[in-house]
């Protein structure tokens, strides 16, 4: 931990949020038990990662209760402090959010991962209406919003625990505001309070089973198939090459949302595992796909397109993999999305600095396997994170190509707002690095109802029944996780 003299020196350099860090051994705890001890209340989060579908990433992140957060809907933003609105803004929320983020000047913490605090939450799909290059084409009709969630919700994470799964250590981080009296001493006291919480045992919320329910499509199979046929008409007319329609399912779910996270991380470990408690609703997800990642001046997108179910035996698994890589439709769709990714990254990267570093490799998850590619670029001077978001949002894998025309068609055929689905969840650090996953394989739990939405990429030779089945396959992991909870994880 830095001394008071070092703290004062950093304040003199113009930093208005200074981290105090304490390192402890926590090898007898898991990220879940630490979340239960330190967080487990509204406006907290747990973020984990599984690399290559097989091993947990080195770091896990637990956000302690956030006193400040932003909610945006349409052209309005509310800033909350301890549950009360303390600031409001009318207009495009994106410049305001960037300016809000930039209010905080912090020194970097050596020897820790790139994320050590900042904005954490989501940008829902309807964020698209705030980008000028989309706004003049999209109608933004007043669609039903049955989930009732904000378009954007971001928490200001100033107290967090970073777990090093390799060393078994935990880094407790508390940011102090040097403009406040006795801020250094109060931050040290807060760290001691957190240490006290760590020493206490936590009540384990056992999952003993509940009423078993089924997921029901709110769109319906036949209406969805009719939309696939309509999209194919647009494709044959030359309007577009691909569109990704989606359908939402819902099921009664009265269990603890954290139990769903437990089941999902076991059943479908993915590069982005996340649990957000937003008070009146929860987001629980296991996304395989980056929307965009910024690390200093590098930017990365990682399109995923092409899906097969996992085999029941190694031989069947290999056969499904070979079948996927030899499927001309799947390959054509994937190549189109690589090109779209190159175009998106190219808009914000230096000339000649865009490259495909992985091309059409297979990544395997619990229920499905995907074709995956990696597109990287070196950012132009002066590119902001909102410029990056504007260039890459929404993902081509959730909209289609050409992107704007595909989004117009989605706007026409889908009866309700997408909400969080198809948007982005993740972190935007104080250091300006950003890591956002696409909000897929993601459940929203609100008012004892679980919502899960999934889509399918429709091209010229798509079969409506197959595309409907693809939406079922993509939702299967979350639905099965919910059913595991209802059967009882701890019986």
From Swiss-Prot:
Functional pathway: Amino-acid biosynthesis; L-tryptophan biosynthesis; L-tryptophan from chorismate: step 1/5
Alphabetized UniProt keyword annotations: Amino-acid biosynthesis, Aromatic amino acid biosynthesis, Lyase, Magnesium, Metal-binding, Tryptophan biosynthesis
EC number: 4.1.3.27
PANTHER family named among the record's database cross-references: AMINOBENZOATE/ANTHRANILATE SYNTHASE (PTHR11236), ISOCHORISMATE SYNTHASE MENF (PTHR11236:SF48)
Keyword presence, Protease: no
Co-factor binding details: Binds 1 Mg(2+) ion per subunit.
Stated role: Part of a heterotetrameric complex that catalyzes the two-step biosynthesis of anthranilate, an intermediate in the biosynthesis of L-tryptophan. In the first step, the glutamine-binding beta subunit (TrpG) of anthranilate synthase (AS) provides the glutamine amidotransferase activity which generates ammonia as a substrate that, along with chorismate, is used in the second step, catalyzed by the large alpha subunit of AS (TrpE) to produce anthranilate. In the absence of TrpG, TrpE can synthesize anthranilate directly from chorismate and high concentrations of ammonia.
One annotated GO molecular function: anthranilate synthase activity
Protein name: Anthranilate synthase component 1
UniProt cross-references to InterPro entries, sorted A to Z: ADC_synthase (IPR005801), Anth_synth_I-like (IPR019999), Anth_synth_I_N (IPR006805), Anth_synth_I_PabB (IPR005256), Chorismate_C (IPR015890)
GO terms, biological process: L-tryptophan biosynthetic process
Binding site for chorismate: 306-307, 421, 441, 455-457
Top-level taxon in the UniProt lineage: Bacteria
Named cofactor requirement(s): Mg(2+)
């Amino acid at each position: 931990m830095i001394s008071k003299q070092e703290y004062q020196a950093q304040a003199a350099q113009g930093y208005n949020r200074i981290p105090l860090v304490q390192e402890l051994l926590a090898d007898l705890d898991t990220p879940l038990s630490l979340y239960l001890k330190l967080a487990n209340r509204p406006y907290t989060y747990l973020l984990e990662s599984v690399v290559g579908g097989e091993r947990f990433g080195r770091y896990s992140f637990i956000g302690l209760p956030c006193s400040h957060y932003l909610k945006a809907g349409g052209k309005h933003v509310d800033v909350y402090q301890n549950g009360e609105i303390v600031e409001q803004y009318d207009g495009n929320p994106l410049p305001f959010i960037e300016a809000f983020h930039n209010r905080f000047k912090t020194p970097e913490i050596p020897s820790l991962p790139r994320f050590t605090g900042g904005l954490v939450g989501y940008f829902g799909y309807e964020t698209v209406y705030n980008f000028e290059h989309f706004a003049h084409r999209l109608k933004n009709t007043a669609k039903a919003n049955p989930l009732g969630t904000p378009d954007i919700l971001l928490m200001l994470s100033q107290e967090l625990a970073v777990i090093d799964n390799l060393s078994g250590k935990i880094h407790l981080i508390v940011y102090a505001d040097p403009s406040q009296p006795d801020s250094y001493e109060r931050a040290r006291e807060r760290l001691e309070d957190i240490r006290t919480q760590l020493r206490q045992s936590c009540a384990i919320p056992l999952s003993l089973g509940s009423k078993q329910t089924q997921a029901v499509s709110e769109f319906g199979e036949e209406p969805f198939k009719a939309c696939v046929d309509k999209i194919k008409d647009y494709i044959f007319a030359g309007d577009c090459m691909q569109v990704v329609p989606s359908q939402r399912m819902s099921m009664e779910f009265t269990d603890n949302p954290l139990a769903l996270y437990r089941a999902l991380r076991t059943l479908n470990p993915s590069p982005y595992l996340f649990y957000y408690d937003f008070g009146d609703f929860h987001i629980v997800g296991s996304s395989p796909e980056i929307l965009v990642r910024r690390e200093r001046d590098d930017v990365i997108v990682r399109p995923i397109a092409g899906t097969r179910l996992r085999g029941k035996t190694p031989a069947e698994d290999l056969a499904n993999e070979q079948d996927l890589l030899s499927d001309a439709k799947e390959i054509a769709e994937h190549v189109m999305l690589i090109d779209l990714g190159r175009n998106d990254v190219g808009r914000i990267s230096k000339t000649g600095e865009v490259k495909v570093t992985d091309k059409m490799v297979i990544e395997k998850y619990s229920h499905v396997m995907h074709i995956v590619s990696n597109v990287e670029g070196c950012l132009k001077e002066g590119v902001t994170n909102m410029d990056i978001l504007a260039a890459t949002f929404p993902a081509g894998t959730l909209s289609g190509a050409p992107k704007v025309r595909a989004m117009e068609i989605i706007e026409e055929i889908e009866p309700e707002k997408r909400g969080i689905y198809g948007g982005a969840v993740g972190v935007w650090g104080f250091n300006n690095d950003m890591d956002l996953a696409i909000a897929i394989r993601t459940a929203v739990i609100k008012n004892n109802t679980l919502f899960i939405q999934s889509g399918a990429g429709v091209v010229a030779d798509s079969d409506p029944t197959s595309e409907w089945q693809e939406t079922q396959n993509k939702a299967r992991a979350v639905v099965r996780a919910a059913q595991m909870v209802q059967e009882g994880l701890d019986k």
